[in-house]
């Protein structure tokens, strides 16, 4: 009973311990063997070397290559399509290949089993041709890398032919860049004489040629033409891309007009006549603009003219001209000098000629030092040409290019502030008066946009004039008011960029003190509306200003917080609305005049 009673009570079987998998079901790791890929390749290479499991023979010109289909298909899109795409070769043990060389195929198969390829200038064309044909992109890229590293004056044009043959864009661009840098050296090579016409024209017409005087380019082109008598008929097609007007007159007389190739071709004679006319009539050079008169440069430089240190002990102003070679540069260097020192002049650019007018040749705090001089700077020849003087002396005025003419607006001189506007015609080398401003104005800023001339701020007759915006219509010869700026400012900067007109910096007066204006705003002519953007970090009035690749550079000027001239160069990105890292001008000057100019990349004539 006791036993039966005991057996009828509840009993529990021993608890089964949970498995390791149950307790750690969430634990999962993936491991990789670092040397597996290398070992796999080595194993496949060993099978090939020992003749094991080989299932295909590729033949080229009676030379046979044994391989594994799976290896070829894994490496090459061409073989993958052949062996898996239902082609008849998929079931063939021996396949004859067309379109590749035996040497090229050998390198390709060796690469498939080793991931390595040995290249030299003798075999690379065969290897590259095979890699392109068999669609083995890694080998194509290795060949491109090798050819870029092997590029030299001697090999450049041959590599360029390969780039063209196999449609390798990146390699072609590298060849072009190298050729532009070393064109004259390459032109002395024998390969240059075999250059196709279209490639020669491509280089001669480009602005990217560096360190090349036009007379040397002409000699290279003539050498190419004289290599084959049949090319003489194409002389004008080639020489039309030589910029004869940029040569020195003596070069035209002594080295160009004496050659039969120039005298026998009617168009070549026209090119020569064009060049002589360009030199004889400098004031009409604007009417003769063509691709042959353009400076060989594809990047504009910031060029800064003159300025004053505002020292009490010395009234001298600077005659130095500095350049910032390109937008990415960090340092200015001296470019040339003006005939006389000048500050607070007007500067404008027409057809890449820089006009510098008015200003002062001695430091004055008022308009007493205003001058009427006007000069034109030719960056190609690094020469100054004195032009007809302004009708009125002007300082702290605006000089603006619009419609092929120059407009000098307002300013001041010994007699006081001015409302007059002068218009300069380069062809006639003369100034005449246009419609005057509504009121006397100096210390204003100006810019051209959409066929109109705009001036803003400055000292007028009332406090409101410091915010005023006036618009000049050259067709109607009339000034009209537009929406005023949000901030009053004088001695500020103004320029057009991407359909907007920016007003930057300057100062404002309060009782007997002056304050920096840090606010920046832009005007949209179609909307007649101003919009504020990120302010400047430091004050700059009486500063130079120009636009390079959508960035505004404000150069030097006067800082009223420091009560001194400054050498800072602030850079504003119009696309991102951000101020970038500051630059530093070589001098601390106010009254600098700035312009964006294409400077020749060669030292010829400089």
Swiss-Prot record:
UniProt feature, compositional bias: Low complexity: 1-19
Q: Where are the Kelch repeats?
A: 301-352, 353-404, 406-451, 452-499, 501-550, 552-599
Which SMART domains does its entry note?
A: BACK (SM00875), BTB (SM00225), Kelch (SM00612)
Q: Which residues carry this modification: N-acetylalanine?
A: 2
Gene3D superfamilies xref list? 1.25.40.420, Kelch-type beta propeller, Potassium Channel Kv1.1, Chain A
Q: Which residues form a coiled coil?
A: none
**Stretches for region Disordered:** 1-20
Q: Start and end of every BACK domain?
A: 156-257
The alphabetized UniProt keywords are:
Acetylation, Kelch repeat, Phosphoprotein, Repeat
Describe the location of the BTB domain by residue ranges.
Answer: 54-121
Entry-annotated residues carrying Phosphoserine: 430
What Pfam families would the database entry show? BACK, BTB, Kelch_1
| PANTHER family reported in the protein's UniProt record | KELCH-LIKE PROTEIN 26, LD33804P
* Function statement: May play a role in endo(sarco)plasmic reticulum (ER/SR) mitochondrial signaling. May be part of the ubiquitin-proteasome system (UPS) and affect ubiquitination and degradation of target substrates in cardiomyocytes.
What's the protein name? Kelch-like protein 26
Q: What is the lineage of its organism?
A: Eukaryota, Metazoa, Chordata, Craniata, Vertebrata
